[in-house]
Amino acid sequence: MLNEVLKGIEGLDNDMIVKAKNRVDSLAKPLGSLGKLEDIAIRLSGITGNMFNNIDKKCVIIMSSDNGVEEEGVASAPQCVTLLQTKNFIKGTTGVATLAKANGTDLMVFDVGINSDEVVEGVINRKISKGTKNIYKEPAMTYEEAKKSLEIGIEAVKIAKEKGYKILGVGEMGIGNTTTSAAVLKALIGCETSQVVGKGGGINNDSFEKKKRIVEEVVKKHNINFDDSIDIISKVGGYDIGAMTGVFLGAAFYRIPVVIDGFISVVTALLANRLNPLVKEFCFTSHKSQEIGYELAIKELGLDPMLDLNMRLGEGSGCPIAFSVIDFATAMMNNMATFEEGNIDNSYLEDVKDEECYIVL
């Protein structure tokens, strides 16, 4: 499955992009005046191949898994919180769940590695094992387990497509996963540890220093093939990270627009884009996470955050907010009149076609 997906991803429909841009530029407004909404609508057309789109059926896919490195004291919350919050996703009481309900977004929650035998009703069970190994002592998982996690993410998108979802978000739950994400990002781009290690869900200074030391050491000790994203996941990642990477790959393969949440989500988008550089064409951002590594990862991906709301929750919480903005972009494209449709003579625009006619540079 994985090789088929990696080889089968095709780029945007450039002919439709040209047509969509011409339509947007002909709408009864100053050129470019709806800013990012215009860019979103045009790229959405390039993804779907349709001029007019709607995202009336929306879903955030959440991957839940435990991380062995938690035993090193890199997180303030106990490991049991992974299971408890996964249950709360289903109850609709978490941050992402309440935001999702506010604009008609569904959640699809997967157990890919929670450290528990409990089967949670409403959660799709794809458990690879009960948590990963402790990356401070040994690789997180085998290479085959890493591939399996990717394929679970791809399968999740297939399920979402069959259910008729038109846009996806990517979220997670897993105590210790800002540590694994920081290690993955460091391995991906070769940056300083201090640039990628933040305080996650909250830790004291002693734990923060320990977290930085662990990330520094694990990237050196496991003989990582830095040119192989799957090997990076297997050595210092997590099942949640692998499955989320698979969601981004699957979204590109099945041509479904997909929204990046915060730090962990953007790291997995970057992993997917390293596996196939066309992936980012299908990705929309949401918010600028306050977790320190986010800015480096989004810059490496070549995208800009849509919003800055001082958020740092994770879970996929930024995705429903971005869905609303994307809804506005589709409303513009679908319902706004062109100059011709509005019986407006736009000949006056001939002298003000350049950006400098609208913005003081």
Curated annotation (Swiss-Prot):
Catalytic residues of the enzyme: E315
Pathway(s) it belongs to: Nucleoside biosynthesis; alpha-ribazole biosynthesis; alpha-ribazole from 5,6-dimethylbenzimidazole: step 1/2
GO biological process, one term: cobalamin biosynthetic process
Presence of the UniProt keyword ATP-binding in the record: no
EC number: 2.4.2.21
Transmembrane segment boundaries: none
Record field: catalytic activity: 5,6-dimethylbenzimidazole + nicotinate beta-D-ribonucleotide = alpha-ribazole 5'-phosphate + nicotinate + H(+)
A Pfam family annotated for this UniProt entry: DBI_PRT
Signal peptide as annotated in the record: none
Keyword Transferase: yes
InterPro entries in alphabetical order: Nict_dMeBzImd_PRibTrfase, Nict_dMeBzImd_PRibTrfase_bact, Nict_dMeBzImd_PRibTrfase_N, Nict_dMeBzImd_PRibTrfase_sf
Top EC group: transferase
Keywords of the record: Cobalamin biosynthesis, Glycosyltransferase, Transferase
Listed GO MF terms: nicotinate-nucleotide-dimethylbenzimidazole phosphoribosyltransferase activity
Function: Catalyzes the synthesis of alpha-ribazole-5'-phosphate from nicotinate mononucleotide (NAMN) and 5,6-dimethylbenzimidazole (DMB).
Similarity comment: Belongs to the CobT family.
Protein's UniProt name: Nicotinate-nucleotide--dimethylbenzimidazole phosphoribosyltransferase
Lineage summary: Bacteria, Bacillati, Bacillota, Clostridia, Eubacteriales
Gene: cobT
